């Protein structure tokens, strides 16, 4: 036997802590590295088995699809979570991927469950292996990251409600620990402290020197008024949310008896490292530098608390990001380098007119456009006894004539296996039960304008986001690995260390650095 990064007789960890940072950027860790202390990001990078980058094998990544992929070890084509929302054309409205009318919320009005995720998660398999004895919990800013990282069989998943700022959950999960109840209603609750919370620079302004593009010398200052509708959604995009996550996570470490059972326990924690919602149209800000600086301190506090309560030697730490980054930066006047505007509503209207010219005007042949996909009126096509594949192909040929369209893929082509290196990302990132009839890929620099003054325009950028992956604790020796690994390899690696089956849709092998090679 050749032992790689593990001790020869490595024990199963008593606790698994999955730390996922929404919108984490590896390049920002590098840019801001000199402002960090020794026991946060630097501790992870120096004491862990560090993979330079993980790759998600599909396009249009968002929070829901990223978290489902990381925790199931499979892509959306299997786990079914293609995005945070989908469009219900029958009722003409957006619907959360988590929506489930059969369950009500605790400390929230939302009706959520994980039932639309078709694959099992790491936590589900741990529950099955332990016959329910392991405790599995998740804490996150948003319901998507909380519920999808917890899974179907978890004890509980908690997120901050957008309306009241309390830690919310769904009655799908039976566990509501007393200390969460006490926290929500006590002097430590967010509402009790909100008036005193002001976000200003933590460091002197000259220390925020990673970007030479900040033009003003005015320190930022943000306050939060509970009476405004966007109070908590905005707060959830500041460093305060990570401190709130830590406050609750420390309650779980203190009272949850993690690591004391005969079977391992699991705690999934999500932090936020994206732009502030109030200035989404700006990049290269002092705010993002301050977010990382404060997150470094929060990581230090959390890792130290785990070490003190359970011991890092008894804990497997899994640290990574969500593989995407949201920016609404707009081009200054006169600086639009290439591209133009793509108007989905006009596209749908013209396509419908084209199909009416061919197949008649007795019906509307197109339902609508959502998330770069066009949905045809399949009932009308079936009633007219027309061939769906032929109509999809004709529609695709017509759409390719539009300015700004790079490629159009049909649902039939993906179902029939007619994909190539360029279109496999559409097959991986969509699910056959939810996919549109046509998937449109626009050229970089083009702007999607939905002709809705309430919506921001979306500028197409095809940049990859560097997303590190770190395994630390539990006898793992420090090493840096510079090959790219797949996001679907994370879950089977964690289950391998736990000595349990991988999630049921996971087809990847565990990373070989964490296995014993014969």
Predicted feature locations:
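Short, structured active-site-proximal loop/turn typified by the sulfatase FGly-forming signature C/S-X-P-X-R
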Residues: 29-78, 135-139
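A long, amphipathic alpha-helix that forms part
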Residues: 28, 235-261, 274-315, 494
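Secreted, luminal/periplasmic, and some membrane-associated catalytic domains
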Residues: 62, 85-110, 119, 124, ...
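Second-shell loop/turn segments in exported
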Residues: 25-31, 54-57, 108-114, 232-239, ...
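Substrate-binding rim/cap in mid-to-C-terminal beta-strand-loop elements of soluble/periplasmic
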Residues: 345-386, 456-498, 514-518
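Loop/turn elements at helix/coil->beta-strand transitions in domains of secreted/extracellular proteins
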Residues: 12-17, 47-51, 78, 131-136, ...
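Bacterial Sec-dependent N-terminal signal peptides
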Residues: 1-12
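His/Asp/Glu-rich, glycine-adjacent segments
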Residues: 75, 83-263, 272-279, 403
């Amino acid at each position: 036997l050749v032992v790689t990064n593990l001790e020869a007789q490595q024990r199963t960890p008593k606790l698994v802590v999955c730390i996922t940072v929404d919108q984490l950027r590896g390049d920002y860790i590098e840019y801001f590295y000199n402002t960090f202390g020794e026991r946060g990001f630097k501790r992870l990078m120096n004491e862990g088995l560090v993979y330079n980058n993980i790759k998600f094998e599909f396009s249009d990544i968002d929070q829901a699809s990223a978290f489902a992929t990381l925790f199931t070890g499979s892509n959306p084509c299997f786990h079914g979570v293609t995005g945070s929302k989908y469009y219900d054309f029958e009722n003409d409205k957006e619907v959360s991927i988590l929506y489930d009318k059969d369950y009500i919320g605790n400390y929230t009005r939302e009706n959520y469950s994980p039932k639309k995720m078709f694959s099992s998660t790491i936590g589900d398999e741990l529950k099955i292996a332990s016959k329910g004895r392991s405790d599995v919990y998740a804490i996150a800013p948003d319901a998507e990251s909380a519920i999808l990282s917890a899974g179907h069989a978890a004890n509980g998943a908690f997120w901050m409600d957008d309306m009241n700022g309390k830690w919310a959950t769904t009655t799908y999960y039976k566990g509501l620990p007393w200390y969460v109840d006490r926290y929500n209603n006590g002097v430590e609750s967010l509402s009790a402290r909100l008036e005193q919370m002001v976000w200003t620079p933590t460091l002197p302004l000259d220390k925020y020197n990673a970007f030479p593009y900040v033009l003003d010398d005015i320190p930022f200052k943000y306050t939060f008024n509970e009476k405004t509708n966007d109070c908590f959604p905005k707060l959830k995009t500041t460093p305060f949310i990570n401190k709130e996550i830590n406050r609750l996570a420390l309650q779980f470490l203190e009272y949850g008896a993690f690591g004391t059972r005969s079977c391992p326990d699991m705690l999934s924690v999500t932090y936020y490292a994206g732009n502030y919602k109030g200035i989404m149209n700006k990049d290269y800000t002092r705010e993002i530098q301050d977010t990382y600086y404060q997150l470094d301190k929060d990581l230090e506090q959390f890792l130290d608390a785990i070490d003190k309560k359970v011991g890092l030697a008894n804990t497997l730490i899994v640290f990574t990001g969500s593989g995407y980054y949201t920016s609404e930066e707009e081009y200054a006047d006169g600086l639009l380098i290439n591209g133009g505007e793509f108007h989905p509503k006009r596209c749908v209207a013209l396509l419908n007119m084209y199909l009416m010219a061919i197949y008649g005007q007795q019906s509307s042949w197109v339902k609508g456009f959502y998330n770069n996909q066009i949905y045809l009126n399949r009932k009308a096509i079936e009633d007219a006894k027309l061939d769906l594949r032929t109509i999809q192909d004709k529609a695709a040929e017509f759409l390719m004539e539009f300015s700004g369209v790079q490629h159009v893929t049909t649902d039939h082509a993906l179902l029939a296996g007619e994909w190539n290196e360029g279109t496999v990302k559409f097959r991986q990132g969509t699910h056959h039960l939810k996919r549109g009839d046509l998937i449109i890929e626009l050229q970089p620099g083009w702007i999607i304008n939905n002709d809705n003054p309430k919506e921001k325009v979306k500028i197409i950028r095809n940049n990859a986001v560097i997303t590190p992956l770190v395994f630390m604790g539990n006898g793992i020796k420090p090493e840096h690995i510079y090959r790219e690994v797949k996001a679907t390899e994370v879950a089977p690696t964690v289950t391998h260390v736990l000595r349990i089956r991988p999630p049921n849709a996971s087809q990847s092998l565990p990373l070989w650095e964490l296995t014993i090679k014969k």
